[in-house]
Amino acid sequence: MKKLIAIAALLISSVATFAQQPVGSFSIQPKVGLNIASLTKADDTDPRFGLVAGAEFMYQASDMLGVSFGALYSMQGCTGTTDELGKDVDVTLKLDYINIPILANVYVAPGFAVKLGLQPAFCINNKVKAKSGSNSAQTDGPDENTFDLSMPIGLSYEFSNFVIEGRYNFGLTKAFKDMDNKNSVFQFTVGYKLPL
């Protein structure tokens, strides 16, 4: 019986630890993490690993629903290797964006949220870097669409104000004006939620 009471007390304290923000409250969450970015219809390329960092604001509309929006600096694009005159050349397409995720956060269990929404974004950097041995060069990338739209889908886990999240951003619009490639980005972040 003592074991049963101890287990019940532990479960109750765990639920309290994982509780969301009070209904009607606002919070801000600075966050930082890793992007694994690629482009659709670019079969001979590899992902570009890059930084994602920024902050998201959330309104806790109910016990099960929060609505959030944010601003994130996001390093995207892809990498690859080509052969020029018998030498391997490593090529990196650097597409950097300011992403503005607008998400519904549905809490399916204490501390766990499923996230879905839309993400407008603005391209702020478009460069191609080529490197062979000790030689490197950089030039402007293909003619980009400065506005991008994607659909983020993710899962997050909250514990004592820390938020661990995995998200996939599915590109809805073309990244370039004259090509059909779209952004495809896996994103892993750690944040800290601060009540406002």
What are these regions (language model features)?
Residues 1-27, 31, 190, 194-196:
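Bacterial Sec-dependent N-terminal signal peptides
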Residues 20-60, 64, 68, 171:
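Short glycine/proline- and aromatic-enriched beta-strand/turn motifs that initiate or cap beta-hairpins
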Residues 30-34, 51-59, 71-73, 100-106, ...:
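Residues on the lipid-exposed face of transmembrane beta-strands in outer-membrane beta-barrel proteins
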Residues 44-45, 108-128:
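A short beta-strand-loop micro-motif that forms or neighbors metal/cofactor-
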Residues 21-23, 60-62, 109, 159-162, ...:
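Outer-membrane beta-barrel channels and translocator barrels
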Residues 38-45, 75-96, 124-147, 174-181, ...:
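Flexible, solvent-exposed loop segments that connect beta-strands
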